[in-house]
Amino acid sequence: MKTLFILSLLLNTELFHNSKKGIKFYKKGDYKTAINLFIEEMKNKKKFKNYFYLGQSYSMVNDNQNAIKMYEKALSGKFSKSIIYFEMGLSYFLLEKSEEALQNLNLALKYDPNNVNYLINRGSIKYDLGLINSACMDWMNAKSIDINSIDLELININCN
């Protein structure tokens, strides 16, 4: 029994180490190594935080299909829903699926309605979809929250 406990402790320590290493490589910009470490860890133990970081890593190597799959899995955990929806929206946008991107940005703003970055990006997606007035409203809302958040020239050129 003691041997089983020690073996279990060693295995869990290695998994924790892979997770920490995965985040370390993610932060250093070595996304391919981070992906491999997160996948290795998740073979044995599913952690929703790792799904998020795995999604981020996939997104950074332009594998947005897999990024979306990982973000969807991350939603089941306790990780911040707003950031997951935001990142998933960006991945959809990069796949040229603007309507799905907009749906996700709407959800991100439901959880964090005054997030300037979300408003600016949702405005850009709306603009891409031809929803000019609505895009301009998002940009103006962002500006009202933080005057320095958006280039006023962008608003003047696109909204007047």
What positions do the PLM features span?
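Register position in tetratricopeptide repeats
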Residues: 27-28, 60, 94-95, 128-129
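Structural marker of alpha-solenoid helical repeat scaffolds
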Residues: 43-44, 77, 111, 145
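TPR alpha-solenoid repeat register
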Residues: 50-51, 84, 118, 151-152
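Terminal, low-structured helical/coil segments at or just beyond the last alpha-helical repeat
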Residues: 133-160
